[in-house]
């Protein structure tokens, strides 16, 4: 493929020598789980986001699961309670809810931003609602005063799925004054899967929050339920980031803002040069509001467009072809009327996107798209 949707080798090439050096340091240090590199990364995440606590986890799904589980252990939620979640999110958001015995309440996204339509949230609130999960999909911030007002009025937690927007900045302050995704709500789950803007070289995640009790419970839950060795407060799990991944992430975090600026530049070239009348371009939002984890267009002939681009050497992906409520594992929700999520699943297509794409390649991809004949 001449223009792959993403090449992890090329993504990590600029940091390779520095990561090799730090890997050797970790190996020679002789301590690989919950060591000083994990502690350092947690401190760096707090400093970057402007939050008080960060707890490293084994992956992004575990971050979301442990965050919600901690609220249950704290008595804030109980099985059977409801969590509002966007209907077009990746299935991990919903798995985190149902794995804890909580009930997902699907709310449709905006067809324009792809994010949760916050104007629809209040009508989904019931006596059993305990939280709103906002997902900053594709790298665009999902946060506004409407969301904050609804949460305050009904006493709801706002939890963030910040798997795709690490580094994005909201134009509206969060609950504790930060403007960074991951520190807007009461707590957030982060993913450092290798394809993310800040990606490890394996699985890794984190929970970020200003709630000290929540952070303490999450840390114990991810360590077999133990805060003190051989003393188990909870029926926990093993979900701990290793020091090697933490060290890699510390290296890459130094370059994240510049990498995100490069992604913004790539998106700008796409938006200025794709002119196909049947191609709907994504909305960029305000400055810093979109860090372009994916550049997602819409097309009513999406599958034909995807095949055409593949024949021209342009790799694409679909994020996501089946919405959660249509998955076999959630067959009890298969008949829910969620037309916007289903339309997006039929139309969205992710173009090549990374910080290393050069302008000439992006221009050529745009020219290829413009030659597509409906």
Positions of the model-derived regions?
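PLP-dependent aminotransferase class I/II
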Residues: 9, 38-43, 48-54, 61, ...
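Phosphate-binding glycine-rich loop
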Residues: 31, 35-82, 95-100, 106-107
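Short beta-strand->loop structural element characteristic of the AMP-binding/adenylate-forming
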Residues: 102-113, 317
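Conserved coil-to-alpha-helix start sites within the AMP-binding
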Residues: 88-94
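Helix C-cap/helix->beta junction micro-motif
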Residues: 100, 153-154, 312
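Active-site phosphate-binding strand-loop segment of PLP-dependent enzymes
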Residues: 112-200, 206-208, 350
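Hydrophobic residues in well-ordered beta-strands that form the structural core
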Residues: 85, 106, 158-160, 209, ...
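N-terminal "arm"/small-domain region of PLP-dependent enzymes with the aminotransferase-like
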Residues: 1-31, 312, 352
């Amino acid at each position: 493929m001449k223009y792959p949707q993403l090449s992890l080798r090329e993504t990590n090439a600029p940091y390779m020598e520095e990561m090799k050096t730090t890997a050797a340091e970790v190996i020679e240090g002789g301590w690989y789980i919950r060591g000083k590199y994990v502690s350092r990364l947690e401190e760096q995440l707090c400093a970057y986001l402007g939050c008080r606590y960060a707890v490293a986890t084994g992956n992004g799904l575990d971050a979301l699961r442990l965050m919600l589980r901690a609220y249950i252990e704290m008595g804030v939620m109980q099985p059977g309670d409801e969590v509002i979640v966007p209907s077009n999110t990746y299935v991990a958001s919903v798995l985190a809810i149902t794995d804890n015995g909580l009930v997902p309440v699907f709310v449709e996204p905006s067809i324009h931003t792809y994010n949760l339509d916050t104007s629809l949230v209040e009508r989904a609130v019931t006596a059993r609602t305990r939280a709103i999960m906002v997902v900053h999909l594709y790298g665009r911030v999902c946060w506004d005063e409407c969301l904050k007002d609804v949460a305050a009025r009904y006493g709801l937690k706002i939890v963030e799925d910040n798997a795709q927007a690490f580094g994005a900045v909201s134009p509206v302050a969060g609950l504790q004054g930060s403007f960074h995704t991951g520190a807007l709500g009461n707590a957030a789950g982060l993913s450092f899967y290798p394809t993310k803007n800040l990606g490890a070289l394996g699985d890794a995640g984190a929970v970020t929050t200003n709630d000290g009790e929540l952070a303490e419970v999450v840390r114990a839950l991810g360590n077999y339920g133990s805060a003190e060795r051989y003393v188990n407060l909870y029926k926990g799990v093993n979900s701990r980031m290793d020091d090697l991944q933490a060290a890699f992430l510390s290296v890459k975090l130094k370059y994240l803002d510049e990498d995100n600026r490069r992604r913004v530049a790539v998106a700008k070239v796409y938006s200025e040069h794709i002119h196909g009348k049947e191609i709907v371009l994504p909305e960029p939002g305000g400055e810093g509001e979109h860090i372009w984890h994916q550049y997602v267009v819409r097309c009513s002939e999406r599958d034909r467009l995807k095949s055409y681009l593949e024949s021209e050497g342009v790799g694409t992906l679909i994020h996501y072809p089946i919405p959660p409520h249509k998955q076999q594992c959630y067959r009890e929700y298969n008949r829910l009327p969620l037309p916007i999520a289903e339309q997006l699943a039929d139309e969205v297509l992710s173009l090549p996107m990374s910080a290393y794409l050069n302008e000439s390649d992006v221009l050529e991809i745009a020219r290829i798209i413009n030659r597509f004949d409906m």
